[in-house]
């Protein structure tokens, strides 16, 4: 009996020692890499992106941006939207079978003669007087994206490097504009609103007979 007790104690100590060594085994580099791989695999493949939301009385136009094709135009539009620049402006020019145009701050007033003559870039891009924001314009970023229905493009004067804040949305395909105006986005939701706006009764200057105001904001969506 005396011999059995020491033997049992020895077995117990051996088992405790083995159990302890298993708990304290270090994590190998391979295991760490596997953990990192698992975490990366669980990350969403499509992180949230910024889209434009143009709100009208007919509903929302949701716009995705082509940042790689026209980075300056996208940046300027987003800055204007975030600063509330577009809020209260209207779609001041509508041509059925062609496009709807907006983004002119002059349209916050009632003087239709000034519609289509206002606006500027949201920051200085090297053109205009740096100390006079009203002179800031965007350099052309013409690209290979075709002017199809739903395309968001920048309006300008006869000078290619004269984009400001005014934009237009194609109500129909307009391939004759390709390479002449900078495409920087497209409507991905709410296309029926384009039709509702473009078919409004209008005057001889293509101004809608009633005001369709907009509010523009930037949101993050999947």
Task: Give the ranges of each region predicted by the language model.
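Sec-dependent signal peptide recognition
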Residues: 2-8, 15
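Small side chains
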Residues: 10-12, 52
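Cross-family detector of peptidyl-prolyl cis-trans isomerase
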Residues: 18-222
